[in-house]
């Protein structure tokens, strides 16, 4: 734990501007519990204090329900969304002591700044490898946060934030990795409304486990919308984003190697004779498979 504070009592927060997402969000706000290093990311469309306050209130309620504790300290920079009157009044009403960094001194909030940078770099790596544009950063952040919360942490004696959080969690839940696959992989989602003798699945891009449903998020390549489903099959050897958004992947990793063109491969004709003196003419394709074409009897 961080000092003598119990989980949820000491919170640091930081807000970061991001490119416009597929849902119109432009800001990433990360709340971090210093005792467990467990982070929760929320997405904002503006920097208005009212929008931040709504997410802040929900986070405080979440901590109260999960741990039985209520935040005692909040540490942030001097962003206008943090120092507005409505935020200050809420902190006074709940007895939360809000401390700020000095102007232009982000080093005074090291945990929040480090986590924001880690999430940003991890999200960028996921998007580039999957060949997806930056408008999918919301799902990249959520996926990376999901993995990070279940990975060993040095400050927790190499335990993970979820395990440290569950020690004081009144509603404990085991770590479930059942829906975890490679980000950006090809997925086929069951079409619940398919007709007889019609395709039974949509070809999609896997975007990680859903935080609000018991299922996973997928980007439908046909409708260009994000859907949630629990009935799917994942092909982790294929990444449709590299083809669907070729400029993204090719810019950083170079063009993908060309696929073999079957039309440019000319099969060779070979004649063989068996022990009985019968001649067989066979076509050899590029995979070295033989297809008998004719038989010449004596």
Model-assigned labels for residue ranges:
Residues 69-72, 135, 155-166, 175-188, ...:
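Retroelement integrase C-terminal DNA-binding domain
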Residues 16-18, 34-37, 49, 79-81, ...:
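Conserved beta-strand elements of beta-rich interaction domains across eukaryotes
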Residues 41-67, 227, 232-240:
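Active-site beta-loop-alpha junctions of metal-dependent nucleic acid enzymes
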């Amino acid at each position: 734990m961080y000092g003598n504070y119990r989980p949820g009592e000491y919170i640091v927060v930081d807000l970061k501007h991001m490119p416009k997402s597929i849902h119109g969000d432009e800001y990433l706000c990360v709340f971090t519990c210093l005792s467990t290093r467990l982070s929760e990311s929320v997405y904002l469309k503006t920097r208005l204090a009212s929008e931040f306050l709504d997410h802040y209130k929900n986070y405080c309620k979440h901590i109260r329900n999960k741990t039985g504790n209520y935040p005692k300290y909040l540490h942030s920079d001097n962003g206008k969304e943090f120092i507005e009157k409505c935020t200050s009044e809420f902190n006074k009403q709940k007895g939360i002591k809000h401390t700020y960094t000095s102007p232009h001194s982000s080093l005074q909030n090291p945990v929040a700044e480090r986590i924001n940078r880690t999430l940003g770099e991890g999200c960028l790596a996921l998007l580039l490898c999957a060949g997806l544009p930056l408008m999918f950063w919301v799902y990249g952040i959520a996926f990376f946060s999901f993995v990070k919360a279940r990975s060993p942490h040095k400050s927790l004696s190499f335990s993970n934030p979820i395990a440290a959080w569950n020690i004081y969690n009144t509603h404990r839940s085991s770590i479930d990795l059942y829906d975890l696959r490679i980000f950006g992989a090809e997925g086929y989602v069951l079409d619940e409304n398919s007709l007889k003798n019609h395709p039974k699945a949509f070809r999609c891009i896997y975007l990680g486990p859903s935080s609000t449903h018991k299922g996973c998020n997928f980007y439908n390549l046909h409708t260009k919308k994000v859907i949630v489903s629990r009935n799917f099959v994942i092909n982790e050897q294929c990444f449709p984003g590299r083809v669907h958004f070729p400029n993204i992947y090719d810019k950083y990793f170079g063009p993908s190697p060309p696929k073999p063109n079957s039309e440019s491969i000319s099969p060779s004709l070979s004649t063989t004779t068996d022990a009985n003196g019968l001649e067989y003419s066979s076509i050899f394709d590029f995979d070295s498979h033989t297809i008998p074409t004719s038989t010449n009897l004596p």
